[in-house]
């Protein structure tokens, strides 16, 4: 794998289930829709020409309703489900061309999987479950035990090594499943609705723990979910699927601000925009800063390096003030903005002045009247990769445009 190649590259991946596969694929190539193909051939189109790229160390959430194809896509990545058409490359190797023995070895060393229903062995202890993947690989007992114990420590189960599964709660069992995947030190983690069976509070805890682990370990993770709130909490890129195709791919902020289709609009209509939209998207860049000594009172003042120093006061004085970080969410910014009628200066990660966040912009955002964010902006893309999947459905011409409705103040 070259330094610039994504960890996962899926190109034109289709999967159909039924006895008339060739006919169904021909109809698919001719532009027939899923329902027509099913009615004519009795063959179900599970995936329709999916293109997907996931960079090394990126967390991608694949979302959609039941039957949208998200779990089938996940299993096509490691060929647990055989693609009917298309190619999949992982770590520079094309799995769709591997023989059975090579594929088994590739799966063992490249992929870890975490399932919704744990898939643990009830007759084994926690430690024996976690070391199972290494045992299958033929790793020596002492080495695999060390790796399993380290993985259990990472997920907060140190001290539970010799317990039976019957002694664990649901959340602890899912931690054990995650530890099993981590112990194998796989480059790619495939997580299929891994937290869906957990109670809400435990689920949120597991989401936070996964985010913390990802920051530390920088694994490449493909996480399947049907819950947009979960996708937002995980903070990665989102690929949203419908009828076997990816209909929108981008950050949570980009999808909430500019849904590509009515289907996507329905997905995001109940999401709190204050929890998703970031200050850098809403900043008024037309408010210029000045140098100390020649600024009107209240004007942001910057130094020679463009860093915010404060606000100008009477007599040429500068009153220190902290700028809002462009990466902060609107929810984090609202308490500060409420105390500043003239708006709050916004700075980048290095403290350089970018502009001012105004109350009108915040109100427009809460009313979902914001311009679509630039997906490449550093404050809108927590994952290193930019969106790379083309929309399978064109933007709806009937969708409301995200334009400001209040005059700038």
Where do the protein language model's features map onto the residues?
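Conserved ABC ATPase "signature" region
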Residues: 13, 27-36, 93-94, 131, ...
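Conserved ABC ATPase signature
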Residues: 164-168, 172
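Conserved ABC ATPase "signature" C-loop
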Residues: 243-245
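ABC ATPase "signature
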Residues: 249-250, 258, 356
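The conserved cystathionine-beta-synthase
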Residues: 284-306, 312, 319-350, 355-375, ...
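A short, proline-enriched helix->beta-strand linker immediately N-terminal to the Walker B motif
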Residues: 183-187
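Helix-to-loop junction immediately C-terminal to a conserved catalytic motif
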Residues: 78
């Amino acid at each position: 794998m070259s330094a610039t190649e994504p960890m996962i590259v899926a190109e034109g991946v289709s999967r159909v289930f039924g006895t008339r596969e060739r006919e169904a694929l021909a109809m698919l190539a001719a532009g027939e829709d899923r329902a027509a193909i099913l009615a004519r051939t009795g063959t179900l189109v599970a995936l329709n020409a999916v293109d997907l790229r996931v960079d090394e160390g990126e967390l991608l959430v694949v979302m959609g309703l039941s039957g949208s194809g998200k779990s089938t896509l996940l299993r096509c990545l490691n060929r647990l489900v055989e693609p009917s058409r298309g190619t999949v490359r992982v770590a520079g190797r094309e799995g769709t061309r591997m023989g059975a023995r090579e594929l088994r070895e590739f799966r063992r060393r490249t992929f870890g999987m975490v399932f919704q229903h744990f898939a643990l062995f009830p007759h084994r202890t926690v430690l024996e479950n976690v070391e199972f993947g290494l045992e299958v690989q033929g790793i020596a007992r002492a080495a695999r035990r060390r790796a399993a114990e380290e993985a259990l420590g990472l997920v907060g189960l140190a001290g539970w090594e010799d317990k039976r599964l019957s002694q664990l709660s649901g959340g602890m069992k899912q931690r054990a499943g995650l530890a099993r995947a981590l112990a194998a030190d796989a480059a790619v983690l495939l997580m299929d609705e891994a937290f869906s069976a957990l109670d809400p509070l435990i689920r949120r805890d597991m989401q936070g723990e996964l985010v913390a682990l990802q920051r530390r370990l920088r694994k490449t993770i493909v996480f399947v979910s049907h819950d947009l709130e979960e996708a937002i909490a995980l903070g990665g890129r989102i690929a949203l699927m419908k009828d076997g195709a990816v209909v929108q791919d981008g950050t949570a902020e980009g999808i909430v601000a500019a849904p590509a289709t009515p289907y996507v609009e329905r997905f995001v209509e109940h999401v709190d925009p204050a929890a998703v939209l970031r200050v850098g998207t809403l900043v008024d860049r037309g408010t210029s800063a000045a140098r100390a000594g020649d600024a009107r009172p209240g004007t942001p003042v910057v130094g020679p390096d463009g860093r915010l120093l404060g606000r100008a006061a009477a007599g040429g004085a500068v009153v220190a003030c902290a700028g809002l970080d462009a990466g902060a969410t609107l929810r984090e910014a609202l308490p500060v903005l409420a105390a500043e009628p003239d708006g709050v200066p916004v700075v980048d990660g290095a403290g350089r002045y970018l502009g001012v966040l105004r109350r009108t912009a915040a109100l427009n955002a809460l009313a979902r009247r914001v311009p679509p964010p630039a997906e490449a902006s550093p404050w809108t893309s927590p994952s290193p990769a930019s969106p790379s999947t083309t929309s399978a459905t064109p933007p709806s011409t009937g969708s409301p445009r995200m334009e400001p409705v209040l005059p700038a103040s």
